[in-house]
């Protein structure tokens, strides 16, 4: 069972506007991975499914995936790793989609030291900081929002981000600066 091949096939289905088919395919392959005890693959697929279900508004299915991810993190004893922090970042987005940005913010902040110690790379760290900034704004934590927006912006400048990623960081940085001024 090749995780990359499965994800590539799912991406092709998504690209062909066959999202429902892609979701069903990922679900089938995740269940097969569990039954074959290919837990690393299963965790990757449940992470993908979490995003799929969150984006389609099926939060019940997203929470089911969250439960499975946590079970797999326990089973594989992955807590404190970059894989676990990435999974927790996905879980935080489900909390946010479910209307609990404070819980999401707490989870995002727990990811930061792991991402730093595991040296996940600047772009992923900038993405985390961007998520923290946006969620801090949503919860009225203007100082946190500006602090993390500045961290994301410094990374974006250092690694010469461009395109949509840079625009997103810039937009959120400006929103955080504006919110800090309007205290």
Locations of regions flagged by a protein language model:
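Amphipathic alpha-helical segments of tetratricopeptide repeats
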Residues: 27-32, 70-75, 109-117, 151-158
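Structural signature of alpha-solenoid helical repeat junctions
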Residues: 1, 40-41, 61, 80-83, ...
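Residue register of alpha-helical TPR repeats
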Residues: 4, 43-44, 83-86, 126-127, ...
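Short coil/turn linkers that connect adjacent helices within long alpha-helical scaffolds
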Residues: 35-38, 75-79, 117-121, 158-162
């Amino acid at each position: 069972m090749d995780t990359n091949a499965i994800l590539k096939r799912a991406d092709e289905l998504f690209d062909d506007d066959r999202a429902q088919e892609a979701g069903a395919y990922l679900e089938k392959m995740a269940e097969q991975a569990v039954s074959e005890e290919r837990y690393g693959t299963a965790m990757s697929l449940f992470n993908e499914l979490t995003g799929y279900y969150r984006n389609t508004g099926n939060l019940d299915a997203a929470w089911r995936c969250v439960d499975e991810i946590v079970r797999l993190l326990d089973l594989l004893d992955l807590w404190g790793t970059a894989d676990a922090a990435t999974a927790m970042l996905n879980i935080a987005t489900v909390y946010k989609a479910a209307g609990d940005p404070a819980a999401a913010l707490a989870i995002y902040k727990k990811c930061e030291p792991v991402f730093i110690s595991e040296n996940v790379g600047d772009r992923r760290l900038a993405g985390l900081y961007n998520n923290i900034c946006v969620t801090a704004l949503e919860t009225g934590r203007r100082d946190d929002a500006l602090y993390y927006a500045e961290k994301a912006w410094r990374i974006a400048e250092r690694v010469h981000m461009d395109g949509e990623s840079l625009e997103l960081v810039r937009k959120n940085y400006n929103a955080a600066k504006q919110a800090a001024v309007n205290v």
